[in-house]
Amino acid sequence: MRIILLGPPGAGKGTQAQLICKRYNIPQISTGDMLRAAIREGTELGLKAKSVMESGGLVSDELIIGLVKERIAQPDCVNGCIFDGFPRTIPQAEALEKEGISIDHVIEIDVPDEEIVKRLSGRRQHPASGRVYHVVYNPPKVEGKDDETGEDLVQRPDDQEETIRKRLASYHTETEQLVGFYQGRAASGENAPTYDKLDGLRTIEDVQKDLFNILDK
């Protein structure tokens, strides 16, 4: 069972992916993790990727697909996997198909932009411990202070509204096109992945319940 989760940053994909991994005993495959592992292990693809990255270039889709093929051939992927942050573009999705890497389920977690901004821009972190709070959903006992040490909380650059809106714009420009691509594939029928869209405004538990119902079919 191979799964792609789609949705904007902050939609809750990471949380749901962890729950899926635990229930179905499948790994979450991140292209970033694969790249780092291949470079660390000095594989042929890893050495190629390292050379490209050191020269300031972008790793090609062809290289990434090669890493994906290597990774899904490993024993822990025998029951399937969840793709994390991949594919991001239609050419990458088409390259997966060309290489015969089938996908069983594509699930979109839909959350409006303004809710994403609210979720992410409200996060505050205690730098020393990594503890994370939220000004609305999980506020500290004293505003702006860590519960345990009383030290100042900070807003990470990634959680600033301007940065979040840039990430959302990038998602809408690139990754959102995959929604139409996979909806079309699902409608075509035979040997195509199923496509489901879930309302990500609901609780983690409600989204999880729907996800499991889809995957248990």
Curated annotation (Swiss-Prot):
Keyword Secreted: no
Compartment annotation: Cytoplasm
Molecular function as annotated in GO: adenylate kinase activity; ATP binding
InterPro entries reported in the protein's UniProt record: Adenyl_kin_sub, Adenylat/UMP-CMP_kin, Adenylat_kinase_CS, Adenylate_kinase_lid-dom, P-loop_NTPase
The protein's enzyme class: transferase
Catalytic function, reaction form: AMP + ATP = 2 ADP
PROSITE patterns linked to this entry: ADENYLATE_KINASE
Residues that coordinate or bind ATP: 10-15, 123, 132-133, 202
Keywords: ATP-binding, Cytoplasm, Kinase, Nucleotide biosynthesis, Nucleotide-binding, Transferase
Residue span of region NMP: 30-59
Annotated stretches, region: LID: 122-159
Lineage top rank: taxon: Bacteria
Annotated EC: 2.7.4.3
Any Gene Ontology CC annotation: cytoplasm
GO biological process, one term: AMP salvage
Biological pathway: Purine metabolism; AMP biosynthesis via salvage pathway; AMP from ADP: step 1/1
Pfam families assigned to the protein according to its UniProt record, in alphabetical order: ADK, ADK_lid
Family: Belongs to the adenylate kinase family.
Domain remark in the UniProt entry: Consists of three domains, a large central CORE domain and two small peripheral domains, NMPbind and LID, which undergo movements during catalysis. The LID domain closes over the site of phosphoryl transfer upon ATP binding. Assembling and dissambling the active center during each catalytic cycle provides an effective means to prevent ATP hydrolysis.
Protein purpose: Catalyzes the reversible transfer of the terminal phosphate group between ATP and AMP. Plays an important role in cellular energy homeostasis and in adenine nucleotide metabolism.
NCBIfam families linked to this entry: adk, PRK00279.1-1, PRK00279.1-2, PRK00279.1-3, PRK14527.1
Quaternary structure note: Monomer.
PANTHER family: NUCLEOTIDE KINASE
Official protein name in the record: Adenylate kinase
Organism: Acinetobacter baumannii (strain ATCC 17978 / DSM 105126 / CIP 53.77 / LMG 1025 / NCDC KC755 / 5377)
Gene that produces this protein: adk
